[in-house]
Regions:
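Structural beta-sheet core signal
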Residues: 29, 119-120, 223, 387, ...
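Conserved helicase motor core of P-loop NTPases
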Residues: 110-116, 124-283, 287-326
Length: 430
């Protein structure tokens, strides 16, 4: 089921799910990320889980810690609904899960159960997974050819919500229509006459952000950027000039996990692993340690959607790097430095095991989460969203840019702020 913003996809899915439950039909609700599952649960009024949590099971310690196999599907005669399916990829840099292809594993898991059906829900105008041009889970022809499945497809196109009253929806629709037409001529965004969309200059930004933190709360306010470099600058400015944080890392800070971690969840009953994209609040900052050429701090974290607080070593170096997480070169450097501690272990296999169990080697990789890239924001929604367009050269407005902008626009529920958007992109009043 494909549908653009405002076409009633959310309302329709909620109605279908709840009608099925009234007929005592088994349903399972899934989404690619924890935040997307939270949004899905919120509008359907039913529990929703991440795909990973539902379909994978960790191997025992003897087989390999942090390795997840496809689990047993005990559901029969069940409809599996998967929201935000545009985010589901074919391949992964993280091969710790199943075959390494989330789409392959999801389909295999669902149909391993007797008489199950799968409903994939998403918006084809959003950003596809990194590294591909389209979202494979929303391509009916691809699914039919690749998996030999019979596909029934519905595409919601008519705007059902009143876009005349919503600047967010009105402009998102205009951007999406440009994507659909394959035309990337100059698009003018309409701000005048809409109370929910506001242009903000650099000089007004901090005051507006501070006001949103007061009105909507920090957890319901997000800045979305084009790059990690820009997000770092915003995070630095917000911490220093709004939150008045003098230390490089403080209690109360909002952070995002930027790499899956299988080490620190092991001692907690309800935590299989800590996921890339999870947002956490720093509850307590413990001792600092400089080791192996990197900086670590022992930290207690309250992670969004988790029942228990987690105590772990976190790596501070990733807070300011312009890469999404620790680079391959730095990871290699850390590995070799840790290995030096175990050179007295003659067996390479035993030495490797020691490194894999080293708590600093397994430190959580984090970034501040007051501002994030659009890929990191995908699947989530916030009451107030600030969009930083970054560099706005003429040749930068290609298909990827408009998908980026559409995805960023549709993260906002109540208020959208356009930071330093050029006059040439804004429709003149009157």
């Amino acid at each position: 089921m494909k549908g653009y913003a405002g076409t009633g996809k959310t309302s329709l899915v909620a109605a279908i799910v709840n009608t099925l439950l009234q007929f005592e039909q088994q349903v399972v609700l899934l989404a690619p990320t924890g935040r997307a599952a939270k949004v899905f649960s919120g509008y359907s009024h039913q529990p929703a889980f991440t795909i990973h949590k539902k379909i994978y099971r960790q191997k025992n310690a003897r087989e390999g810690v942090g390795i997840f196999n496809l689990g047993f599907n005990g559901n029969a005669n069940t409809l599996f609904f998967v929201d935000e399916a545009s985010m589901i990829s074919m391949g992964s840099q993280d091969s710790n899960f199943g075959t390494g292809s989330l789409l392959d594993d999801l389909i295999e898991f669902v149909y391993n159960g007797r008489n199950n059906r799968l409903v994939l829900i998403g918006d084809t105008a959003q950003l596809p997974p990194i590294g591909v041009d389209v979202s494979p889970a929303l391509e009916a022809d691809f699914l039919q050819v690749s998996y030999g499945m019979e596909i029934y497809e519905a595409n919601l196109t008519d705007i059902m919500r009143q876009s005349e009253q919503s600047g967010i929806l009105y402009n998102a629709t205009r951007v999406r229509e440009m994507i659909g037409a394959g035309s990337f001529a100059k698009l003018l965004l309409r701000v005048a006459g809409f109370p929910d969309i506001v242009r903000v200059s650099g000089g007004e930004l901090l005051e507006e952000l501070d006001q949103c933190y007061s009105s909507f709360g920090m957890d319901e306010t997000m800045v979305i950027c084009r790059s990690n470099k820009r997000a770092n600058r915003f995070n630095e400015g917000i911490r220093a000039r709004i939150l008045y944080r003098e230390d490089a890392f403080s209690s109360g800070d909002k952070v995002m996990i930027v790499k899956n971690n299988y080490f620190w969840g092991a001692e907690y009953d309800k935590v299989d692993f800590i996921a890339n994209g999870d947002i956490a609040t720093v509850e307590k900052v413990g001792k600092y340690k400089d080791l192996y050429g990197f900086h670590f701090v022992n930290t207690r974290l309250s992670i969004y959607g988790y029942e228990e607080e987690i105590t772990a070593w976190v790596m501070l170096d990733t807070l300011t790097t312009e890469q999404p997480a620790l680079s391959y070169e730095d990871y290699r450097r850390l590995y070799m430095a840790v290995e030096e501690d175990y050179m007295d272990v003659a067996s390479k296999q035993k030495r490797f095991k020691k490194i894999q169990e080293n708590e600093y080697y397994n430190a959580l990789q984090i970034k501040f989460a007051y501002a994030v890239t659009c890929h990191k924001a995908q699947g989530g929604q916030w009451d107030a969203v600030f969009i930083d367009p970054g560099w706005q050269g003429e040749d930068s407005h290609d298909d990827e840019y408009w998908r980026w902008l559409y995805t960023a626009f549709t993260r906002a529920r109540k208020k959208l702020y356009l930071i330093n958007f050029k006059d040439e992109m804004i429709e003149m009043e009157g």
